[in-house]
């Protein structure tokens, strides 16, 4: 079927467009949030094709995967159709609730025509979804392969816009963690990170917006993956690191406690325990490799691509009946 969706979350979309459908990705002249089109740093198949708003009117979709309330407005404006009534629709909620948690009401809570698909059970539980039908389709990862070497006695962190997102993504924990072992931060929007948290450039390396494949290669050379995130949906970067075969040290918050089994690393709400675990893995390559193999096995079992695509096929089939 023809599936309309906006390029909102590149890593998630990379997995989604691996399916058997025709994926329509709006593109506008400015390639802004309403029309980013195809990815530039991920490899997407030809079935994920760019369409202008004008072309969409001629190439009508069978279903739309909404990811922002703005998408509802654009469907009405560009197609003259009402999502959930004239056009089958699913609202994909990427994010953990914000604001007055656990009383945060989902923007689509007061309707029943469009199901909300959460990406974690934690998110489904903590949102007030009201009368809206909900389901959970957990992440699926395009397996990058077991690339782990751990040859560098350093930790790796992947986070986008840590300066803007502040305590949400745990930037304030980096001084403590980098004292335990040198670490490298990969991601977008890293400018100002040194200044924001007083980080020592001799202990912390910054790698701003590398291509995904290159990032995976470099990340896998680090001894341990660190996930200092306090409050966000389950990061795809964490699952990718597990697929690479990296041991994990992270905060025991949101869905991480479900994703990382005990044998795959260390989760704790005590920053000092995380620093200790980083230090231990850096100084014990054999233990790090063993935990990394357990991490990869767990990720393949729970967050495999085939299961993810099958779950989405089932949901899209259900809403288009």
Predicted regions and their residues:
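Extended catalytic core of nucleotide-activated donor transferases of GT-like folds
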Residues: 9-12, 24-113, 122
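Conserved catalytic-core segment of nucleotide-activated headgroup transferases in glycan assembly
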Residues: 126-129, 142-199, 209
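Short alpha-helical segment that forms part of, or immediately flanks, the ligand-binding pocket
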Residues: 216, 239-243, 254-258
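A short alpha->beta transition loop at the rim of the catalytic pocket in nucleotide-sugar-dependent
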Residues: 223, 245
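Aromatic "clamp/platform" in nucleotide-sugar-dependent glycosyltransferases that forms part
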Residues: 230
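Short hydrophobic beta-strand element within catalytic cores of glycosyltransferases
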Residues: 247-250
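Conserved acidic donor-binding segment of nucleotide-sugar-dependent glycosyltransferases
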Residues: 262-272, 280-286
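A charged, aromatic-enriched C-terminal amphipathic alpha-helix characteristic of glycosyltransferases
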Residues: 283-317, 321
